[in-house]
Amino acid sequence: MLVTLGIVFGDIGTSPLYVMKAILHVGQRVDEPMILGALSCIIWTLTLQTTVKYVLVALRADNHGEGGILALYALLRRHKRKWIYLLALMGAGTLLADGIITPAITVTTAIEGLESVSPHLPVLPITLAIITVVFFVQRFGTESIGKSFGGFMLLWFLLLGAVGTISLVSYPQVIRALNPYYALRLLATSPEWFLVLGAAFLCTTGAEALYSDLGHCGRRNITVSWAFVKTMLILNYLGQGAWILCHADVAASVNPFYAIMPQGLLIFSIVMATGAAIVASQALISGTFSILSEAMNLDFWPRMRIKHPTHVKGQLFIPAVNMAMYIGVVLILLLFRDSSHMEAAYGLAITITMLMATLLLGFYLRQRGVSRILCMVFVGSYCVIEGIFLAANLSKFLAGGWCTLLIAGVLFCMMLVWVRAKRIRRQHISSKPLSDYYQIISDIKADDRIPKYASNLVYVNHTGKESTVDDKLIYSIINKQPKRADHYWLINLEYVDAPDTLEYSCSTLVEDTLYSVTMRIGFRIEPRVSLYLRQVVEDLVAEGRVDLTSCYPSLRRYGVAGDFRFIIIHRVYYPEDSFDRRYNLLMSLYALIGKISIDEPKALGLDTSVVVVERVPLILSRREGHVRRIVPALPEGE
């Protein structure tokens, strides 16, 4: 339970810092109908979006215990509607964009509380310093401080509930906001309902984390914890509303979150708010690493260098992403400078994430046998609700919403180009029946006149089938330079829907000569082919299926194992080989995006000292015509 509070609820738990302030910022008046309506919008947004959609429905759509929009897509990627991947790309792109704005707004709002103590305190430099420290410590892992997050967030939520309850006593009538009538009345009668609804939506921006962190905490822990968290949040929102109605003349000029704090707790609350903002930022950063790791294994994103700073399962650190996020957060801070301006940039991207999740959930429920009518009711209802939220947040586009939408758009386009280019490359891999080459491979092994290339020669076969082989792979063994070896190993990598799967099967195709190994890897598992192959070989040796002792007498007498060499076939696209401008543009962008990627041997976890990369042309379309022979004219008289 405590761990769940620290991991899952950091983002949604810091929303009281800025939601009511944002509502006061966009509202034209401060009176009872507006405040009760706004509070009712908050309460029922939390109920419909977080409780019903995510806690009651989405948490049941688990992929072997894992959650999140990419885990959900992994369950659906074999769906007959092949365009479903676009929903996952859009949802992932907007979720990653939200991960850049969240640390900026939460930490800034927390530090702005110091202005009530010292109005001339430089908020921006302090915020930049805290953000810098948060991103710097990622490289060392957060195992030690992460253990204290749960207890800290428990204290934070108790503080929210306690001060909210104390403030609620001053205007108990505010509890009427629990009735959805006041939200509906605001939407029907208030000219600024659109802006108020866009601000109220910020209360649920952390709801996606409940689903994304399903694998870390479990459905039961999240469900039980949410009952406590939601109660504390509602008490705090009601307390802020009560204070606003009692101080309507000055409410718009202060942050009601800090205004309801007893004077003796003000400094303590600022410290707690800053700590909660750091916890929320940490959760978003770690979540970004996890999302991109999944995207890499789903072939949505280029392979990047991943580090494991601690022994905790699932704790990742991606240096390039950490630096990119840090630069993005700093630019957001320098561009908007204070939380009031950041509120306009916040919420738009995550609305799109939720809308994409709704559509994917609809396909999932239908796939699981839920009736078509119920699926249509669920998807239709939430498309209407989230469509209204999206329209409300689009009203903030020019004021700052363009920023996160631009980030999300760039990320979506990068992923789309990567996916489309990868598919085209796979489509142009020519495969041949492997059985046609059994005899010639055996003959090469037996031909002493061919210099031995390696004791064990390993290829990664990209056809995806054990019965077929990439023609360029065969060309490498037979034609390019005949490669004699004692054993030939063909590795087939199969990425499966189950997140933590790691298993293999091995077939002996030619006795004591040719072996095919299929490795089934879950989308949360980092591929480390060298390590996995070593385990496979050890199993085969123990079973007596292969003898790996060196063939050289001077080494064999001491039981020294033969060497391994890996051959990687790398296809290179040359734009001048094609007149197709569409292919040229797509593959040029693919090559540009690929510059942030590590090379294939490192991506597969191979020992680069024993890897040879052979480059071959990737031909997508051929130029028409042929070389014309010129016959020289014979001298006269001949």
Task: Write out the residue ranges for each language-model feature.
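The structured alpha-helical core of multi-pass membrane proteins
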Residues: M1-E638
